[in-house]
């Protein structure tokens, strides 16, 4: 058989998979690239808990998600048990207009979906990024929406917000 298309890079969402499986995907990818074998089999992988990822973008949801380049004047990103931030931004960093607008990934893990939602609600509520527009408040609204909390989501959920 043949591959019509193949994406050989790690996906943005890989921290979710890593947290619920306990597998360091980047480490395994490097091992494979260097000719080594995987350190586990499919049967070794057990799913544990629930993880949620929010991509924090420099964009304005109220203006059609228009990109928001500029300089970050102040910021605070949450931390703690079950919270992961993947980012390279800092206060004084300038977001250029030329690239993808994602400036951070906020990932949470908990024992179950309800706890993970509560953790994400809290974490998003703590995020401070000033000087640029972000989609943090928009995502906060999503994870606090009753339909999201109850899992009553379909392809028209975002349009109903």
Which residues are covered by each model-predicted region?
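ATP-dependent carboxylate activation and anion-phosphoryl transfer catalytic cores
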Residues: 1-161
């Amino acid at each position: 058989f043949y591959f019509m298309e193949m994406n050989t890079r790690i996906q943005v969402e890989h921290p979710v998979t890593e947290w619920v499986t306990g597998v360091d995907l980047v480490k395994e990818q490097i091992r494979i690239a260097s000719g080594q074998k995987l350190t586990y089999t499919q049967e070794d992988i057990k799913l544990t808990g629930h993880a949620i990822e929010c991509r924090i973008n420099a964009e304005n949801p109220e203006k059609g998600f228009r990109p928001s380049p500029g300089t970050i004047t102040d910021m605070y990103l949450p931390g703690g048990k079950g919270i992961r931030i993947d980012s390279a931004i800092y206060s004084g960093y300038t977001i250029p207009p030329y690239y993808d607008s994602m400036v951070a990934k906020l990932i949470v893990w908990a024992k179950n979906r309800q706890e993970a939602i509560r953790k994400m609600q809290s974490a998003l509520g703590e995020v401070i990024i000033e000087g640029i527009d972000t989609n943090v408040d928009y995502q906060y609204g999503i994870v606090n929406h009753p339909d999201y909390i109850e899992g009553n989501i379909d392809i028209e959920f975002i349009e109903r917000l």
